[in-house]
Amino acid sequence: MKKRIPKIIGVVGFSLIILVVGIFAYLYFNHAIIISEGKEFKNQGSPIIKSQLSKDEVKEDIDYIIDIMENTHPIFLEDVPESYYIAKNELLTASNQGVTVGELQYKVSRYLSSINDGHTALWWEENMFLDIDWKYLDGNLYLLDSNKKLTDKVVTKIGDIEIGKIIESIRAHFPAENYVAEAKNIERFLKGKLVLENVGVDCAKDILVTLSNGEEDKILEVEFISGSEYRSVNNGIYSKVIDKNIAYIRLGTCEINSTLKSVIENIEKYKSEGIKDYIIDVIDNPGGDSNACSMLLEALNMKGGAYGGMLRFSPLAQDQRGYLRKSGHIEYKSNNNAVKNNDINLYILTNENTFSSAQMLAVWVSDGNLGKIVGRPSSNMPSNYGDVLKFQMKNSKLIGQISHKKFIRPDIGKDKEQILEPDIYVEYGDDILERAIDYINK
């Protein structure tokens, strides 16, 4: 018996080792094991657009961005579009000569845009914009009046260049996941001096914009102004009761903080008071932490389905996220096991600027039939790439971001849809909140 004890201990010990190794292997190949907090991205300096780069500096930056792209983005584990290889060859050709930082920015932007991922792009450096407001609808660029309302005047030329030529250049150089994103790009980048110069507009003099109402042309003289082209938006988080019986929740950004927790406390109060109609407003919400959206649904005694997808490990992801692995990938399965609260009527307000995690909230509600979407569709596809990592090119100092995850919506039968269409569509210029209130009170 005594002779058998060491043998038994050995067998048990070996079995435990096999078990531990098996558990570790399972976790290693099926879960994102995080072993550190990851390093915070540090800006190594600002790009100087007019600065000249040597041939060697250009080549080094181009080699770097191609390496980052192909070793980080999940699309390279799937079917890569032919447009990517065309753009890559064009970029490699550009590495044979010196260019300015601005010229390199344009070429790299075209390269990154070839996969049409709205999360993967350069942080576009531009500080001069036409002092004009317009809206791209149904294939036309309409002038807006001082109150941001549509006019009947359509932009047909900027300088001597036909508007169609400029739009084609924007389509080629900036990522768009759907027609909404394309319209946003046109509205934004058509104002930029660098973009206009690239297509041949003479920006050394006052810019003449040709307008047409279908009967006659009119010339409008427009100046460039410096500063951001972005309008200010309300990114607050708060709640209130409107019309005595509707709980309005403004989620201006997807962030878990004290104000969100106060809103959740208010929701409990609203429920105890018998309020049945709830509006969550994510208009112009750029995204953030999707858990903030989950917390709001949970407070309403609801639960969305689960996004599936893929996480790709890479040196960049390991550095910034603290993953154990720096290569390979793991996959997750979607499910649409949503939980609806039939005692509550839920309405999600969205527009073209509802993005990333905020768009996920709308998809959860739509796929799980938890409520109604009111407004206009997002520039973000319901299934998309995301969870961005930052990068900076050594010589040009250009900064950008790249997705390292793919997200597949809960209802996989709708995976290929490019747009999440609202249940109640609200035309541009009409108030989305007012439309939702009218629908509730009808």
What are these regions (language model features)?
Residues 30-45, 49-63, 237-442:
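C-terminal "post-core" interaction segments
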Residues 2-278, 284-286, 302, 306, ...:
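Flexible, low-complexity junctional segments that flank or bridge functional domains
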